[in-house]
């Protein structure tokens, strides 16, 4: 058999490259985000005068450009700092990768040239190692550090707000927090909130025309000439605009549509491929969400699918009865079930509707599955 990679690599493709369709790629220009770049820059610019900039909190739904804009501003500040020979560092931490205070501080120490292991030291030793980096006799001039905590809500839920407390209590450190959730500060204790000197920047969703502009720029360098039409770009943009203006989703639609064209050995992307791509992405997204749910939430979802198949009306009380049978001895309280229901609804897997049973009978929550039941079953099998 010939080398499979050579065979695939030599196959005709409508792609010139896929890298520009990856949401992690940071282009030279970010359409419709100039004002947000300036908003970040107006705070960070203080570091060029050797002043620690204020903390920043950036909000916005998935795919609104929060991370891309922040990393774009990071690159530009680093360029100016290098030209002026200033000791300014901007370090990016994704809190899904480093989700405890210890891990984040160890990572920052490593990025700043101090080898600290990810385990084995006490918390006090790691904190001291981090703070020692800011002494003049270690790095010469005062170091100004801007720490970008992307998906900061993850560490707050997982490990509390200790990392924010430590960073805000360290001289010459500024925090830029990024979150999809505008209410994430509910996880921060008052004494830590008071030490945050944060300025807030909100990223609105992209509209359909803005998404068209983004996709046009990316498609020019991603596809062979004539492979993509304005109609395809408009369709991808319209579908993504309905998904709360998610540019990541728009890029994923475009890339998946191109992959389908390659599979069908078509030299152009047809609009029907976009619709097929939408189904693929949604199926993949649902499976990814379900398999990463905590085991107890999976049990609740499994109980909902069971009752759905039996065509029963799903009240929280009936749901808890079935859940108890499934979970057996490893179960949570009835009150905790309400939290799981709310979280599953936020993820779009279910919906709830409060109805009145009539005078004197109170109100009842009715739960409805919002996804293809076979797909949920498939995802629940994957977890095993």
Curated annotation (Swiss-Prot):
One of its GO terms (biological process) is DNA replication. The keyword ATP-binding applies. Keywords: ATP-binding, DNA replication, Nucleotide-binding. GO terms for molecular function: ATP binding; ATP hydrolysis activity. The keyword Disulfide bond does not apply. It comes from the Archaea. Pfam families: AAA_22, Cdc6_C, Cdc6_lid. InterPro entries: AAA_22 (IPR049945), Cdc6_C (IPR015163), Cdc6_lid (IPR055237), ORC1/CDC6 (IPR050311), Orc1/Cdc6_arc (IPR014277), P-loop_NTPase (IPR027417), WH-like_DNA-bd_sf (IPR036388), WH_DNA-bd_sf (IPR036390). ATP binds at residues 64-68, 206, 218. Belongs to the CDC6/cdc18 family. Involved in regulation of DNA replication. This is ORC1-type DNA replication protein. It comes from Methanosphaera stadtmanae (strain ATCC 43021 / DSM 3091 / JCM 11832 / MCB-3). The gene is cdc6.
